[in-house]
Amino acid sequence: MEFVVKMVERRKVKITVMKRFNPSEVFEKSPVTPVNPLGECELFSDGQEFLVREDGKMPEGFCTSAWHTIFCNVRTLAFGGDLPWFKEKGVAISCCSDGLRPVVFKLERI
């Protein structure tokens, strides 16, 4: 029996920062007391865009923690896959794992 492996072309993925949340938008009363006052994530700006090239590396200046959280969806889109819970093809909405002040991203295969 012979197996043939076909390489799938990788595509670029655009990441757009849709919304940064302030802890007061997430909780009426914070479940923990931060060491320093927290506002919206300071690493991103709403509307900011990043490009993931065909090599799949994290874009320069992107938050490592957020990248770790959204990478599975980025990889799925880059290899031509789609998420079954969205009607739109080549699109995903993903969120970083900061539970107090999350950042929501739109991922688009281009």
Task: Please tell me what each predicted stretch does.
Residues 57-68:
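Short, Lys/Arg- and Gly-enriched loop/turn segments at beta-strand edges
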Residues 2-10, 109-110:
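Long, non-globular segments of proteins
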Residues 66-110:
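Short, compact, well-ordered microdomains
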Residues 14-30:
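Short, basic/aromatic beta-hairpin or loop at an interaction surface
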Residues 28-56:
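Short, flexible N-terminal segments of the mature chain
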Residues 3-5, 53, 80, 85:
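Ubiquitin-like/PB1-type beta-grasp interaction modules and other compact soluble beta-rich domains
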Residues 16-18, 53, 108-110:
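A structural detector for beta-sheet-dominated domains
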